[in-house]
A protein has these predicted regions:
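Nuclease-adjacent, charged terminal/linker segments that flank catalytic cores
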Residues: 1-90
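Long, compositionally biased intrinsically disordered regions
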Residues: 2-19, 212-243
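Rossmann-like adenosine-cofactor binding region
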Residues: 100
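A short, highly charged nucleic-acid-interacting micro-segment common to nuclease
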Residues: 103-122, 142
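A short acidic/basic microdomain associated with nuclease active sites
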Residues: 121-144, 148, 152
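Active-site beta-strand-loop-beta-strand hairpin of nuclease catalytic cores
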Residues: 151-160
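Catalytic cores of nucleic-acid endonucleases
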Residues: 162-230
Length: 243
């Protein structure tokens, strides 16, 4: 059994068991009910950039030799996020005393969203492989290129972004397209991302045109994925983009 098939089997165990949660939907209040201070704190949590958060799903897969459970993922995500938050100027003693629980909720919501997207990426990779594509999924594709999956077939390549079908999430993808540098061993490497003609796959928490939902996990419909990987979004697979 390939590693991808093992990952898919593990995800199916999660889906059949406790399922996949996105706890923002069960929050006692929503964005429209929050105070100005809470909205600002939510934005600050969302704007935290930490490499260890970006690679967490891959790092846990490597250390555990399997896809982590959602609780395992959240526990590690919370540790890393708060290690970063505690260094921020805005995390004052007053904020800590009066807004700690709200900040934890914001981190949880962000972690839930990231975990769900990671599982969808794995399941989509399996869908594509079943249709004869060679699929690449790696932390450096995401960190450097801002791409979730790369699919190759018949000397053509597609660069795939997978995100939630919401204005907030779509804006995050556009923001990723503006990144211009990356640090390795304290050395800065400059580059320019270009998402033009990339494939964008959008999922919803509810069943619809693009996906079904199995115990909290959206799964893309085959036709939606296949239609998206068309000639218009294909690049020639040559020496310039082989990995």
């Amino acid at each position: 059994m390939t590693e991808l098939k093992k990952d898919v089997a593990r995800i199916m165990q999660v889906v059949k068991g406790e399922g996949v949660k996105e706890r923002v939907f069960s929050a006692k209040s929503s964005y429209y009910n929050w105070s100005k201070e809470e909205r600002e704190l939510k934005a600050r949590v969302e704007n935290i950039r930490e490499r260890k958060l970006m690679t967490l799903i891959f790092d846990l897969e490597e250390s555990l030799q399997r896809v982590p459970s959602q609780s395992e993922y959240l526990n590690e995500y919370m540790k890393i996020a708060f290690a970063k938050i505690k260094k921020e100027d805005w995390y004052t003693e007053i904020v800590k005393a009066f807004n700690q629980d709200f900040i934890k909720s914001c981190v949880t919501w962000r972690a839930d969203r990231a975990y769900k997207s990671s599982l969808i990426e794995i399941m989509t990779a399996m869908q594509l492989e079943s249709k004869g594509y060679t699929v690449f999924r790696h932390k450096y594709l995401d960190m450097v290129m801002g791409v979730d999956l790369v699919a190759v077939k018949d000397a053509k390549v597609w660069y795939i972004h997978i995100t939630k079908d919401s204005t907030f999430s779509k804006d995050k993808v556009l923001e990723k397209g503006t990144y211009r540098d990356y640090w390795v061993n304290y050395k800065r490497f400059n580059y320019q991302r270009n998402f033009e003609n990339h494939v964008e796959l959008f999922y919803s928490a509810d069943e619809g045109t693009n996906n079904v939902v199995k115990n909290g996990l959206p799964l893309f419909k085959f036709d939606y994925v296949m239609d998206a990987l068309d000639e218009q979004h294909a690049f020639k697979y040559d020496d310039n983009n082989q990995m």
